[in-house]
């Protein structure tokens, strides 16, 4: 494995929430794979913790990762055995996390859980869902068109944009690219190169790494909280 310390994940999340509340950042952005194998009870527990962050005056923005929706491996483990448990659909995800980006969105995509949110008067978030059941690890054609319209609107409004995706915009490693880089990332890279996008934030690869597209845009990949440093 990649060194995930699952036995301590609850303690890690509690410490993370406490640190976020203490440091009071302008926002908390979570780019997906939020739960333990997509289990509903894991989603519900996290939403309660994120509510504490929101109640401290810190806006929270979430996206689903590839392990968060319609999970066939959602389970509860006890001793040497396990029991299958419920996962969540895309609609249920949006309902559970409605207060963390969806309710206040400037625009929501009709074909995915993508949305645009305002961080300030001149800075927006493009939260791009690349984990639909119709196109896993890819941007849907309709979603790409929607994103193009949102970026054009941001430019017209004099706003810069931070893009966010779960999977990566570029290959961060020669060993880890297939299944990690968005399958049609080239279309996104071309779009972002002519848009007011400052950078892309991603995860998925469980590596802490920064890399640039051919146009000079940074893709900043953040490792998993449950992976040992």
Tell where the protein language model's regions lie, with residue ranges.
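Short, electropositive alpha-helical surface patch
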Residues: 42, 46-54, 178-189, 215-226
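His/acidic metal-ligating clusters that form di-metal
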Residues: 24, 59, 124-126, 134-218
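N-terminal active-site segment of His-dependent metallophosphoesterases
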Residues: 1-40
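Extended active-site neighborhood of metal-dependent phosphoesterases/phosphodiesterases
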Residues: 45-145
């Amino acid at each position: 494995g990649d060194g995930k310390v699952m036995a301590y994940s609850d303690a890690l999340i509690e410490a993370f929430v406490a640190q976020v509340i203490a440091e009071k950042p302008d926002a908390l952005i979570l780019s997906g794979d939020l739960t333990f194998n997509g289990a509903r009870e894991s989603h519900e527990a996290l939403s309660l913790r994120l509510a504490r962050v929101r109640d401290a005056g810190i806006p929270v923005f979430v996206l689903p990762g590839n392990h968060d929706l319609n999970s066939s491996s959602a389970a509860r483990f006890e001793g040497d055995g396990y029991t299958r448990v419920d996962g969540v659909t895309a609609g249920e995800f949006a309902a559970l996390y409605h207060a963390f980006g969806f309710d206040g969105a400037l625009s929501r995509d009709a074909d995915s859980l993508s949305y645009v949110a305002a961080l300030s008067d001149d800075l927006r978030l493009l939260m791009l869902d690349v984990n639909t059941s119709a196109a896993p690890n890819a941007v849907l054609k309709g979603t790409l068109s929607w994103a193009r319209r949102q970026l054009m609107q941001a430019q017209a409004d004099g706003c810069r944009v931070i893009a966010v995706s779960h999977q990566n915009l570029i290959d961060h490693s020669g060993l880890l690219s297939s299944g990690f880089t968005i399958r049609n990332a080239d279309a996104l890279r071309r779009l972002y190169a002519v848009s007011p996008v400052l950078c892309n934030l991603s995860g998925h690869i469980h590596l802490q790494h920064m890399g640039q597209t051919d146009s000079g845009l940074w893709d900043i990949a953040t490792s998993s909280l449950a992976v040992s440093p």
